[in-house]
């Protein structure tokens, strides 16, 4: 008899609207107005009654003529929306004054930590978390403080703006609050009338935004949030540039919030048990909303800048690196981690610098010095690759979010995905230029409620009040009068008040009204994982720096990846095998440098373990990229180990179907078809010692229910037909590069 496994209890959280909001009518026109003025992250139009619509959430939207035409219209609106250049303005001078704190000094690695590399443990965490100090988080109803965020990461329950508890099934090992540096804390200071800044006339429209009588999903509350999100940033910039708002007073608010973030990180940092990092998000973008966001992570907290460097110091990421280099010269070590390259419209990994010059050694060396790691997966999609870039990779369509961040305009593919960047880095090396794209991989969440939403059956997205109900997440339809008002109201507003964020916010799928655009494409992802001697700032940071890190889409899959000509099968079988692999090879993030005397093909030692709370593993893969004899980039996906001891097909280089299934009515799975562990010693049969190449491991689970299917089950409705019902969670190791001998 086939056994089934319910991954987790289907009712992980409760929905209970606050009493103060129950008296408010959910007048559905709110959704339309919210979309038109950009409160929702994305808005788009769909044809009525189709199961696969023009604004599909699938990866094929880049070939859809209607979406392409809409993108052209949005691009024109983006050009017209900011005639005074407020969005790209620099309104603050770069500041390098340090806070000398002393108490935040890094402890030495303890005697109880690992004494050899082989004893390193895998630690899991999130380096991308927003709280009430982020302007958008506060506008979405978030009142979680940095202290609340750290309590959540340690396993405690905190309250979602929708009124229900959020709690992880297991605590995390490390966490970093990364609030937006741009106007850090200013939305909160404007809204809360006990602050001095709230006395400014600029702040008056935002007074009491998150007071108890204006807290919920009702009409009045949502309209005020609309005004905050749509007008806050441009009005603040315009006010500072005109002199209406005192620049120094704003800097005072920013510095006060920054100090509180630092204090919270130090208060919850518990070396050996739970690690926090002082951090923030640098939220730059191009005029057409090409995403250039980075999270800046500080190694310690004994010396820190008195204010974070934001887009309002400069929108040029190279200026951020200059600032970081300057701090490094004063003894302040940090790194920046790019994220959501998928929404960068080709800007994150382009082949020219900010000024339009070809990339050179100086650019590459500075970028790698400051950005050794990239965030490859998070709630706003996975940035590994895209089916149109990797058409022979049948797993390339995983949790694709195809739009630029905060718009419904398509994001260009070239320059936006990590695997292509790795390949372009090889091409640059081949031409004699230092590789600027030689990075390690992590995942993180980008939650805006203080709570990482990384579990499919426990997912409430990232948008606070705007995603606290399943219909707001796009997984279940609106019904009755709500549905008709949302649907037709959004169309009227889209026609009468075109928004650079996109068109109508709601669409019909098989006759049912759903939220449209990017929100349904969001995923319950991801986690950063590091192989470190112990759970301390110093040990974890050094793991990030040497790129001995890996990413997961949420489950705590574990993966090791080594390369070296002298690795052997016994390393998989003996107690000292890992120590010997470290001694005789390199691990993820490293280089295999061939010499004229030794051009032997490296062997790859790969080990993966399933998360006991998730599904078993289905397959272990190696992704290879290289430059061929014609100087062209090539890639290949190779299955190297299969669940159940099955053999990889020598022609297709794929594992056979292992019979894994999901019961969509209950989300039950058949766990006996998968593996708790997969490991192999693999050699590339096509290895050419004369070419540049990279390899990384990808671990694929058996299928499980996507979060949207869990939502549908709870609501007692069928899963949304244009969303994937299941997915295959995964992990990615950082790459290992193979460098040919010179001459």
Residue ranges and their predicted role:
Residues 39-42:
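C-terminal motif of bacterial Sec signal peptides marking the signal peptidase cleavage site
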Residues 44-46:
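Bacterial signal peptide processing site
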Residues 297-298:
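Long, charge-dense tracts
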Residues 202-239, 649-654, 664-667:
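Low-complexity, serine/threonine/proline-enriched polar segments
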Residues 55-146, 150-153, 157-207, 247-250, ...:
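C-terminal functional module detector
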Residues 22-35:
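Sec-dependent N-terminal signal peptides
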Residues 1-24:
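N-terminal secretory signal peptides that target proteins for export/translocation
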């Amino acid at each position: 008899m086939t056994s089934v496994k319910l991954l987790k209890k289907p009712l992980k959280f409760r929905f209970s609207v606050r009493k103060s909001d129950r008296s408010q009518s959910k007048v559905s026109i709110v959704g339309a107005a919210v979309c038109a003025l950009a409160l929702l992250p994305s808005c788009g139009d769909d044809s009525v009654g189709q199961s696969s619509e023009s604004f599909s959430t699938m990866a094929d939207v880049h070939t859809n003529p209607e979406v392409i035409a809409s993108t052209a219209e949005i691009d024109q609106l983006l050009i017209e929306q900011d005639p005074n250049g407020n969005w790209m303005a620099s309104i603050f001078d770069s500041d390098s004054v340090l806070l000398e704190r002393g108490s935040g000094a890094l402890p030495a690695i303890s005697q109880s930590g690992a004494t050899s590399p082989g004893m390193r443990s895998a630690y899991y965490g999130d380096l991308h978390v927003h709280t009430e100090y982020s302007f958008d988080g506060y506008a979405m109803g978030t009142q979680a403080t940095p202290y609340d965020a750290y309590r959540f990461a340690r396993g405690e329950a905190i309250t979602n703006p929708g009124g229900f508890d959020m709690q992880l099934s297991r605590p995390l090992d490390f966490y970093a609050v990364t609030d937006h540096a741009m106007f850090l804390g200013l939305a909160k200071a404007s809204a809360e009338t006990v602050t001095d800044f709230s006395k400014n006339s600029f702040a008056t429209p935002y007074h009491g935004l998150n007071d108890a009588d204006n807290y919920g999903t009702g009409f009045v509350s949502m309209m005020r949030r609309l005004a905050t999100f749509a007008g806050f940033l441009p009005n603040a910039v315009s006010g500072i540039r005109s002199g209406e708002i005192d620049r120094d007073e704003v800097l005072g608010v920013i510095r006060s919030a920054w100090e509180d973030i630092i204090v919270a990180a130090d208060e919850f940092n518990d070396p050996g048990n739970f690690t926090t990092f002082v951090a923030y998000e640098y939220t730059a973008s191009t005029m057409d909303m090409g995403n250039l966001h980075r999270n800046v992570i500080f190694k310690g907290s004994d010396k820190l800048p008195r204010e974070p460097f934001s887009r309002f110091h400069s929108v040029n990421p190279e200026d951020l690196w200059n600032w970081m280099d300057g701090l490094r010269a004063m003894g302040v070590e940090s790194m920046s981690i790019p994220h959501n390259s998928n929404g960068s419209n080709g800007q994150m990994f382009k082949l020219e610098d900010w000024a339009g010059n070809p990339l050179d050694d100086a650019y590459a060396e500075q970028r790698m010095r400051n950005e050794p790691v990239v965030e490859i997966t998070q709630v706003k999609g996975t940035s590994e690759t895209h089916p149109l870039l990797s058409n022979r990779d049948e797993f390339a369509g995983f949790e694709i979010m195809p739009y630029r961040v905060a718009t419904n305009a398509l994001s260009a593919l070239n320059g936006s995905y990590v695997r292509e960047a790795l390949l372009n880095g090889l091409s640059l090396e081949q031409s004699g230029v230092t590789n600027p794209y030689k990075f390690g991989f992590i995942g993180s969440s980008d939650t805006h409620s203080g709570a990482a939403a990384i579990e499919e059956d426990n997912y409430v997205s990232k948008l606070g009040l705007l995603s606290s109900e399943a219909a707001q997440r796009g997984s279940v339809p609106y019904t009755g009068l709500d549905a008709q008002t949302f649907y037709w109201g959004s169309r009227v507003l889209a026609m009468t008040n075109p928004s650079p964020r996109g068109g109508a916010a709601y669409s019909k799928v098989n006759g049912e009204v759903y939220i449209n655009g990017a929100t349904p494409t969001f995923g319950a992802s991801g986690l950063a994982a590091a192989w470190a001697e112990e759970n301390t700032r110093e040990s974890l940071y050094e793991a990030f720096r040497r790129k001995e890190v890996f990413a997961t889409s949420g489950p705590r899959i574990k993966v090791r990846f080594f390369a070296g000509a002298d690795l052997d099968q016994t390393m998989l079988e003996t107690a000292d095998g890992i120590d010997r692999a470290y001694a005789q090879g390199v691990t993820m993030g490293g280089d295999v440098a061939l010499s004229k005397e030794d051009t032997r093909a490296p062997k790859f030692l790969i080990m993966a373990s399933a998360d006991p709370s998730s599904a078993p593993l289905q397959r272990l893969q190696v992704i290879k990229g290289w430059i061929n004899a014609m100087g062209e980039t090539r890639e290949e996906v190779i299955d190297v180990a299969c669940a159940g001891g099955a053999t990889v097909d020598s022609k297709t280089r794929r594992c056979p179907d292992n019979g894994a299934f999901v019961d969509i009515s209950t989300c039950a799975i058949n766990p006996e078809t998968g593996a708790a562990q997969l490991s192999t010693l693999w050699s590339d049969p096509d290895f050419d010692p004369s070419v540049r190449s990279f390899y990384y491991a990808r671990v694929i689970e058996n299928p499980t229910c996507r979060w949207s299917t869990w939502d549908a089950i709870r609501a007692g409705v069928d899963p949304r037909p244009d969303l994937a019902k299941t997915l295959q969670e995964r992990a990615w190791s950082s790459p290992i590069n193979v460098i040919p001998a010179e001459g």
